[in-house]
Curated annotation (Swiss-Prot):
Keyword Cell inner membrane assigned: no
InterPro entries per record: Aldolase_TIM, Indole-3-glycerol_P_synth, Indole-3-glycerol_P_synth_dom, Indole-3-GlycerolPSynthase_CS, RibuloseP-bd_barrel
Annotated protein name in UniProt: Indole-3-glycerol phosphate synthase
The EC number(s) this enzyme carries: 4.1.1.48
Organism for this UniProt entry: Pyrococcus abyssi (strain GE5 / Orsay)
Catalysed reactions, as listed in the record: 1-(2-carboxyphenylamino)-1-deoxy-D-ribulose 5-phosphate + H(+) = (1S,2R)-1-C-(indol-3-yl)glycerol 3-phosphate + CO2 + H2O
SUPFAM superfamilies noted in UniProt: Ribulose-phoshate binding barrel
Protein's gene: trpC
Top-level EC class: lyase
Amino acid sequence: MVIFGLSRRIKRCTKNPIIAELKVYSPKYGDLLRGRDPLEILRRYERAGAVGISYITDPKYFRGNFDFFKRLCKETELPVLRKDFITTKEEIEKTAEAGGSAVLLITRLLKDKLPEFVDHAREHGLDTLVEVHTLEELKIAIQTNSTMIGINNRDIGKLELDDGNVSLTAKLAPLIPDKFVKVSESGITTLEDLKVALKYADAALIGTALMKTEDPEKLLKSFVEAKIC
């Protein structure tokens, strides 16, 4: 694990910084693996130029597996972001012990505990991606010492069953101080979506769109290498 490896890679990236999510299941679209080897998809993401890898460990809604997260961290030199509904500091420690580089902390879940969870994660060498969906949540997030703030274009409270779009990034990202790395999450399916996202954010996190296609390497490469004016 490289300390704060994800935020550093985003800052140094010379192409479009895309965090590619290895998403095995979606409450909206169902099975996204469709019999494919997840490690082969990882290799495709690496070849396409992903700036980092994201994996959801939640088993209930997204059918994630923490043991596979640990394996991912060993299989790739890219920084790996753990996404889950984290509510205990023990989960943060487990993430660091597994070799993770970053952890998602959801403002809506943690509320007034958010600052101490951010500090705890950073003490363990983890980047923190503090997730927001509303202006009220953003006001809380910018008071923390997080390295990154993520704008979830979809409502995680609805388990991504809503049709979010990058207009929320356009609305909230300009309000985030420059000391934070800004990440646009979810709802990015086309090059036009990506252009809007990266006009306002420093990086984009894309999962479903990549997993739904038969050739995730080709699509991701087109996103990474696209000219963003």
